[in-house]
Amino acid sequence: MARIPGILALILVIGSAAIAKTIPEYDGDPVTAIVVHKEARKMFLMHDDRVLRSYSVGLGFAPDGHKKIEGDGKTPEGRYVIDRKNPNSKFHLSLGISYPNAADLSYANSIGKSPGGDIFIHGNQDLKHRIKQGWRYFFDRDWTAGCIAVTDAEMTEIYSMIGIGTPIFIQR
């Protein structure tokens, strides 16, 4: 009985190592910026002024305009940075975007609302959450609560290429 916690810990460590190995190591030119064009539904990974990769993206369920308050379904616009990486996301993998910034907070506070938060670049949801999302997930390309979505395979590639601190410019 005393061995069970040790065995469980070993399984957890081995399992975590196996998950970490599924993310390939990127050895190309570093990504110096991410640029998102909301109207075109495109995201570009840049090295200086050269496009390294481009992806089609899904956005928040009400994508027109800048995110101002929690629950508005908009994807923010402006300059932010990647401030965290989540290998255990329910959306496969995810990269946190530093929304809200000082201006976002100031505006939301001025109208007595929350600006929201937890905006990410992420992959698709797991099946349980897809079913809960219903028709929007399956039939609408803009299905997130304000995040930027790509396929799981694309997210694996993006996750391996992006470091914390990478600037992201989200444009109309």
Briefly describe each language-model feature range.
Residues K21-A33, L59-D83, A102-Y107, D152-A153:
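N-terminal post-signal-peptidase region of extra-cytosolic proteins
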Residues R84-R172:
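Exported/periplasmic cell-wall-interacting domains
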Residues R50-A62:
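Short Gly/aromatic-enriched secondary-structure transition segments
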Residues S16-A20:
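Sec/Tat signal peptide C-region and signal peptidase I cleavage site
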Residues M1-I4:
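Positively charged n-region of N-terminal signal peptides that target proteins for export
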Residues G6-G15:
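Bacterial N-terminal signal peptides
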